[in-house]
Amino acid sequence: MSRGLGDVYKRQRLIRAWGFTYKSVAFVWLKKNKKAASWFYGLGFWTRANAEVCLLATKGHPKRQAADIHQFIISPIEAHSKKPDETRDKIVALMGDRPRVELFARQTPPGWDVWGNEVEPTAGLWSRWPEDSGKEDVSCPM
């Protein structure tokens, strides 16, 4: 699950609602411009946004397979909202070649189950957003 830094709390609630256990901010993607060596800056309400985070959540008790995986990914932006392929490569190195799902996916990479409104879902999750059991709305970070 990847998105800007805002609403991490709501995303953690959504992770729990789907039966996963939140583990960590696995990766922080620092975005570079496509054609220049400078940083990419998007829009933002308080500050001009650059970083996106990838949250790691699990089911069961998988073991970490590698201890040399670094959190930062510095990579240029690509097509709208496309994440660097390095992100998925690092997840496989970290967790091993096991079943895995990308939530809010925008493409269907080989070897991955996906779920989102821009892909044909292959993961056995809800066909719609899970209901919130609390008083706050659960927003789905797209």
Residue ranges and their predicted role:
Residues M1-Y9:
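Single conserved hydrophobic/aromatic residue that forms the stacking wall/gate
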Residues K10-M142:
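Class I S-adenosyl-L-methionine
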